[in-house]
Amino acid sequence: MAGKGEGPAIGIDLGTTYSRVGVWQHDRVEIIANDQGNRTTPSYVAFTDSERLIGDAAKNQVAMNPINTVFDAKRLIGRRFSDASVQADMKHRPFKVVSGPGEKPMIGVNYKGEEKQFAAEEISSMVLTKMKEIAEAYLGSTVKNAVVTVPAYFNDSQRQATKDAGVISGLNVMRIINEPTAAAIAYGLDKKATSVGEKNVLIFDLGGGTFDVSLLTIEEGIFEVKATAGDTHLGGEDFDNRMVNHSLQEFKRKNKKDIMETPGHIRRLRTACERAKRTLSSTAQTTIEIDSLYEGVDFYSPITRARFEELNIDLFRKCMEPVEKCLRDAKMDKSTVHDVVLVGGSTRIPKVQQLLQDFFNGKELCKSINPDEAVAYGAAVQAAILSGEGNEKVQDLLLLDVTPLSLGLETAGGVMTVLIPRNTTIPTKKEQVFSTYSDNQPGVLIQVYEGERTRTRDNNLLGKFELSGIPPGPRGVPQINVCFDIDANGILNVSAEDKTTGQKNKIRITNDKGRLSKEEIEKMVQEAEKYKSEDEEHKKKVESKNALENYAYNMRNIVKDEKIGAKLSEADKKKIEEAIDASIQWLDGNQLAEADEFDDKMKELESICNPIIAKMYQGAGGDMGGGMEDEGPTSGGGAGPKIEECRLSCHFF
């Protein structure tokens, strides 16, 4: 339950390319717009010589600052640096990714003239902080509690890393829920009035960087996931990459120039390709057009929808494999699926829709929910349920999700012994008794794996721990009880107990592949606070600078005004003009001064200008400026209402 004074609980869809935030208010979900008026916020973080930018501001300057603008952190989170997908992505990324402690991918940027390294969790935490601030600005109160979504096919380490990102951002992550399950909630509430009896629903969720398929049965508010499948490295970004590679070859063919892969050129090309891809969802042909792409040469290349489909057809077909796997795992025939629901921006691609419709023998696809907002919508509903804020319409909803991958441990000969098969409903707890492999064995090494292969070397090692102090005895005699316990977030705890001695040991899977320690998380929390206060200082500095600039130029306009200028003595006029010129000159040479320096200059200028302007108003007997007689300036308050209004307006520059 959310504590008092913590504000409403929010739902955050932390996407690869875009993120969204929703809240349950007035018996409905509100997807909240950011300060630019957009309901989607780019999952981008940029670092410059003077500040850190997050969201739209970061994405808008990416072409000018590609090597210090970070995106796609979700494709790095919870992975090893040596993972094939991490290595493959590096050629498409302008920013630097290096191997950190425990093979953790670290992102290298230049921030305020210094080389810095950030973990993917830290970048994701910055995006989460931005989403939290968007919600706080809308709600007018602080927000502490959130439900955050992850792809259904995220493994244990990716889920735990996402939870860590929430902690670093200062959020209490009440629950990690699967994106297709969240979308199913949006679908279920949309259909609640008209739905009767049990329905089998397939959620097809193809986003910017990840792909999930989940099959659920929905009946009277109970959402039971039967099976899930997917690919945590397939989405719109991959379709963009194909277009970028195609365009590079086109440019080389037409101009006999090989674009040196300088980040700025590639970034401009990628932005144009992404725009073309979106256009091709609604038209049959478009043009990729970039002025002066490389060495002054313009790039102009028409592209048809058919060509785009040809470039990506293998990836589009690959999207159908998890659909088949999901139906197989759920032991369900495709004819028994009542609705196929499209979620994620990439489901707008006509060829993807056509392949899916053909697979389901021409069945009409369900497009009644917003594919971009459905996940955040479901997360906001779940947040309301967990914090006790929702009405009776949502409080009786029950989510029964599953674990996407089989979990087990290594037994003699490197065999994977499964304790929890994939698609087991969570939370769940399974126990099994094991024994020793050799005589007088003093301890056992328990190695925990996830995956579907029979040999552990082909699966993913999550973590390991030792149970020592086993009394000497023949092989097969000691009894070691191993317990696997998965919580509602899909995060695994493993414990082992020697039944003879009562000796116990346990592990919350903090795998060996770069999971953050408690100390590292604490350090990152402190750094996040530091960056936040630096951002606030920068904002204050800009506001103080703008205030001084506006005041100086406004005073100059007032003095130059013939009606007002005529009322000033030559000495006063000269005094004000000299003070204004000195301030403007100081501003030009001190753009990087601190906020208090701008404030001091402001006070200095006001102390010269205000008394003269006040004297002029009094001398005019209040007959100036149309009814401003009671609004005379006071020291430190600006010269009359016109100036005060202008000082306020500086916030909009």
Swiss-Prot record:
SUPFAM superfamilies: Actin-like ATPase domain (SSF53067), Heat shock protein 70kD (HSP70), C-terminal subdomain (SSF100934), Heat shock protein 70kD (HSP70), peptide-binding domain (SSF100920)
GO cellular component entries: chloroplast membrane; cytoplasm
Matches recorded under Gene3D superfamilies: 1.20.1270.10, 3.30.30.30, 3.30.420.40, Actin, Chain A, domain 4, Substrate Binding Domain Of DNAk, Chain A, domain 1
Record key words, sorted: ATP-binding, Chloroplast, Membrane, Nucleotide-binding, Plastid, Stress response
Broad class of the protein's primary localization: plastid
Record's subcellular location: Plastid, Chloroplast membrane
Induction description: SCE70 expression is neither significantly influenced by light nor heat shock.
Matching InterPro entries: ATPase_NBD (IPR043129), Heat_shock_70_CS (IPR018181), HSP70_C_sf (IPR029048), HSP70_peptide-bd_sf (IPR029047), Hsp_70_fam (IPR013126)
Coiled-coil residue spans: none
GO biological-process terms attached to the record: chaperone cofactor-dependent protein refolding; protein refolding
GO molecular function: ATP binding; ATP hydrolysis activity; ATP-dependent protein folding chaperone; heat shock protein binding; protein folding chaperone
PROSITE patterns (alphabetical): HSP70_1, HSP70_2, HSP70_3
UniProt family annotation: Belongs to the heat shock protein 70 family.
Chain's role: Sce70 may play a role in the transport of polypeptides across the envelope membrane and into the chloroplast.
Misc: There exists a 70 kDa heat-inducible gene (HSE70) in spinach leaves with sequence homology to SCE70.
PANTHER family according to UniProt: HEAT SHOCK PROTEIN 70KDA
Protein name: Chloroplast envelope membrane 70 kDa heat shock-related protein
